[in-house]
Every structure is written in structure tokens, then in C-alpha cells.
Amino acid sequence: WSPFVKWDGENLVGKSWENVRILGVLQRIALCYFFASVIVFYGKTKGAYFVGMVILLLYWFACYALGADGDPYSLQGWFGNPIDIDILGVNHIYKGEGVPFDPEGFMSTPAAIVQVIFGFLVGQYIQLKGKNTDMLSGLLVAGLVLTFTGYCWDLVFPINKKIWTSSYTIYTTGLAILTIGV
């Protein structure tokens, strides 16, 4: 499989660009690492943490305020769909959910950027503390706090991987930190 060519039985034939999906997992990872590195480089540790928290809260506000009345956190009601479609075009959006929706679209990427920032902060913490039980204890506590916070936030902002909600970011970051700590 390739997004640009296909095998017709005898030759490689170029595919039409009309329906090529532009964003995917690897593109999202690249965007997240780029923006997270810029935030960390210019904001340093405290600034990166602050920017990350602001992004998660603003994303929550945007999902609620700009989403469809009654169901702003569903695929159909999520505010990012029309924006991603306007930017990318409906032919370049993933359609596997029954509605044109891109799980790696531009509008759900900010919360994923914060997850990369958290990864940096955890790595920095591990380097600072060194390999010892205090470091592991700190990771376990942080992991439990974040997992619990994400779980509680789910009551008002559902954990939803498809739109990469802020509660999903906090919850899964907590689980990842717990895994590292174990």
C-alpha cells in the first residue's frame, strides 16, 4: 500500500490526488513534536507547563462553546469537523466513522501537542531525579493524580480519543506515567 502509487498487476501506476488523505498518524506526530519543541524551547519548563494547561482548558472551552447544542463532544457535534473539512477538503478527510471526520485533524492536534509536552516534562523529571525509588514514587503519585483527574474530568468533558479531549490527554498521560513508574 502506498498513498501515491498502486500496482495494477504489471506496473506501478500513480494514484489521483483527489482522494488522498492528507493528515494521518505520522503527520500528527510530526506536528506535535514540532510545536511542542517550539513551546519547550521558548517557554522552558514552567512556560511549557503553563502553555499546556492553557491549551487544554481553551480546547475544552472551544469544544463546549463551539460544538453542536446538546452533543458538543460527539463526532457529529464536534466543532473541529467543519473547520478541518474547510481546511483540508472533504475528499481528504477520513470517512471510516460514517461521517467525514479526521481523528488526526488540525483541530484535535493541540491536545495531542500537550501530551508531547507532558512527555518532555516526565523525561526531564526522570533525568533530574536520577534512577532511585524517590523518582519512581514521584512518578507513581503523578500518574495516579493525573489518571484520577482525567477520570473525574470525564464527568463533564468525556474521555474521547477520536477528538482527543483534554480529559483523554490527562487520563492517558497518567496511565503512561504509571506504566513507567511500575
PLM feature spans:
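Alpha-helical transmembrane segments and their immediate juxtamembrane cytosolic regions
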Residues: 1-182
